[in-house]
Each structure stands twice: as structure tokens, then as C-alpha cells.
Amino acid sequence: MKKIVSMIVAAAVLFSAACASASETAEYMWAELPEFISFVTEPCSNIALFSADYNEDDIIRKIYEGAAEQRSEITVSDSPLVEDSALTSSEIGKKTGEILADIILKVKYTYPEMYFVKNGFTVRRYTSGRVSVELNYSEGIDNVQKRMRLYAAFKEDILSLITEDMTDFQKAVTVHDYIVMNLKYDTSYNVYDAVNMALGGSGVCQGYAQMFYDICANELGMGCGFAVGQNKTPGEAGHIWNVINIDGAWYHTDATYDDPLFIDSETEALTDAPLRVSHKYFLISDEKLKSINPNDSIDRENIDCAVECSDAYYDENRPWDDSSSAQIIVNDGAIYYISGNKIMKKSDAEEAVCIITEGANHIEAGIGIYGDLLFACYKQSIYWIKLSTGESGQFYNSSSGSAMIKYLRIDGGVLRFTLSEPNSVRFSVGAVPLGETDGQILGAELIDGKIVALLRSTAKKAALYAADSEGFVKRASVVPGLNRVFAEYTGDAAYSLRLLLWTDGLKPLDAR
């Protein structure tokens, strides 16, 4: 099961014995690993909702603005946050520190760009009533700005998939599936925030939850928040996930648990399962959450969550549960998904229809859409289905012995797929460019888990591609007579080509 290292809050409060005319300073130290926190934002709001006697929204704004400029001291209030004649000065100082610790946590969770704010801080209370905090920063503004530009580009890739006519469900599943399919769980437990998770490609549950929140709440204006569960074993790591508002009702969504892992049969290491996405923990109720996995190490009976997720609509209406970890595709106002051995299409408020029959044998566990073509995999082949006419045909056939194509996805005009040997849990990843959709991929070879060359052929011409670290490069366009092409490019060390080019009679040229 996916875990993060234990998170423990240790607080030490120190008070000076200042006289009444001098400033009174209280220090509240925060442990290096902060505790999880639960809160929500309502739809179309980009600030968390809290209930308090003081203006927390105003304090959040001041801390955010001050931290963005990396000020050494930030005034959060001109008057005391705690006024109670029954409390001693030390007790007031401690309570003030606890309040601000909670608020700073909320700032860090709500805004991933605050990742550079370290966990230790100092609270200062002055005789005038003014309250300030001194924050510590892990890196300078210039480096933060560079990282944020990269993070903004990552988010833009997700947001480019969102259209104004999408339903709440379609937006949520698009964000969920993109995060799961493009990122992986950090089994070294080093990355906790969304920014560094996006830049490095991996993170723990805190990073998954923060990124889902940032896109859904901050960018799309959807109601979203965090829920927390403690480990059933005292002292072991807890877990954090999201709650999301869909059409006025709240549901649990756990992208971390929906990102499959497997144990590598050779290294015995816990490894990301590429191109796979589960929806087992997507849009479920409180009751479903409690019953979904009785052996879960997380106590789902006693969670910390600011809202009730009592609506069971998606508990009972989730045909994609049978999709074997295939992506749910949103395209032209409809969703496409695998249910059993059928590819289904469902438009909003309409019944789902099957666009591929049970006997078509085109379905394994992956689908993708590029223009008017839907791609699906079965055994050693990838097939295409023309959505406008229902025509279908073979697009690609693996040349890697008995390896089976299991999963696929399309991103940026490139179709990526996984290959695995029978009775093995190891995966290789290949890719095919989709710039020319009228031809069929005739042959390819995987080297070190990456496809390094392929041939696309139509009745009149053929094109040879090679992949290097920069991406796909079109090397030649030729008419039939492929022995010449084969001889010319197999010795090209720059691309490490190892081709199987197929021609008449489907005979490999290198065997003739």
C-alpha cells in the first residue's frame, strides 16, 4: 500500500519575561514534517472557508503576500488573536501559535506555490496588540520563480484538456486521470508538494491531493478539499486525499490509491504501473469508502473531513469499475470507457451505448482518441475505430515475440503503450507518433523499454521514423523497395536502430 513517512507535530513554546513596556515575543516551533489538515472550499471560491472570531481570510492573504516577497517578518493582525482574561500570558501565546500554525498549514496546502515556506516559524506578540510571524524559506525568489514557470506549464497541459461545455464530472475525471497517468508514487517518500511532484514526476499522497485541489479549486473554481485518515497502527503514517463537489454533492476521490503499483518480478521493488489508472476511489460516498477495502491500513471509519459525502449516486453508477485500469476519455461532450469487453460511449443525460460489440476482440485495457479515430488494444495489436462511420482496422502489431499490448494512451499526438510478457508483471513502454493517420504501423522494435524506430506505410508510400531523446524524427519517405531503406538505416548508430520492416507476404526483410 502507498504510504508516506510518519508525520508528527512537535511544538515547543518559549516565552520571554519581558516587562509591560517592552514587546512580548512568543516562539512556536513547528516540526519538519507537518500534520495533515482537512478543509474544503466551496464552488467558485479560491479561499478556504473557516469559522473563527478573527478574519482568517485576511490573515491568509497577508501571509501569502508576505511569503511571496519572502519578507523576514509579516504582520498578520494589528490586534490580538486571542483575548481571554482567564488565560495567562503563556497560555495566550501558546493558543496564538496554534492558531497561526493551523492557518500556515492551510496556506501551504491551498497554494502549491508556497512550497518553499519551511515548517518552522516564530510568532511575535507586541504590547500594542500587533501579531506577526517570521517564516523560514527553503530557497530564493529567483529559483522559486523558475520552478513556478515550469509548474504553470504542467498545469496548462491539464487545463488545455478542459472545455467550457464540460460537466463537473468530465472536468474531475480529466484532472484525475491526467495526474494518475502522468505522475507516479514516490516510493522513496521524498516529495510532498505538488510543484516538485510535477517537476520530478513523482510524489506522495500529499502531492497528489494538493495538485488535484489546485487544479479543481484554484483553476476551475470547483468545490474541493482534503480529508485525512489515521493509520490503524499507532505511530504509522496516515493518509490524505480529496473531496470534490459534483453537481452540488460531495464525494471522496483518492488519486493516490487510484495510481496502481506493482512488484517488479525481477527486482522485487515496488514500481509504478505505466499508463494505468484506476477509478476505484473516484467519486465515492462515506459508506463506500468504509467498505471498499477492509484490509486497508488507514482507518476509514474515523476520518477527519469538513463535509459529509452521503450521496451514493456514483456508488451505484460506475460501469468503468470493470475497465481494468483504463483511462476514461472525455471527447466532444461524451465519455468513452471500457466496461467488461465493450467500449462504451455516454453523453450527458443519455444512456450509454456500446460502440464496439462483444465479439469484436479489440479490447484489452486501454483506449485513446485522436481526431475522429478511437484506438484500442487487444493482444499484440492496436486497432482503430472511426467514430463518425464505425469503420475499423488494425493500426499496429507488436514485433516483440509473445509480448502483449496491455495499456495505451494518447498525449501530444503520440500514442504510448505498454508491453508485457505472459505471466509477467514487468512492463516495457513503446510509443508511436500519430502525425499521419492514414497509414498502418508495420513494424517496430523496443530497446531498453523504448521504441526506437518504426515504419508507417500506405499503398503508395512508406515513412521511417526514429526516436531519440528529443522525440520522433522522420528519417525517410520512400516508395516500395524497402530493402534499400533497411540497409541504409540499420547501421545508423546515432539512433541505435534495430528494425523489423515487413513487406509482401509479411516476411521480415532481415530474414531474407
For each of these PLM feature ranges, what is it?
Residues 340-341, 456-462:
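Short proline/glycine-enriched turn/loop motifs at strand-loop junctions of beta-rich domains
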Residues 140-197:
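Secondary-structure boundary elements
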Residues 207-287:
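Hydrophobic/aromatic-rich core segments of domains that either
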Residues 402-433:
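Blade-level signature of beta-propeller repeat domains, shared across WD40, Kelch, NHL, RCC1
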Residues 320-330, 360-371, 401-412:
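Repeated scaffold domains used in trafficking and secretory/extracellular systems
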Residues 21-156, 346-358, 384, 393-397:
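Linear, non-domain "peripheral" regions
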Residues 337-338, 375-377, 416-419:
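Residue position within the beta-strands of beta-propeller blades
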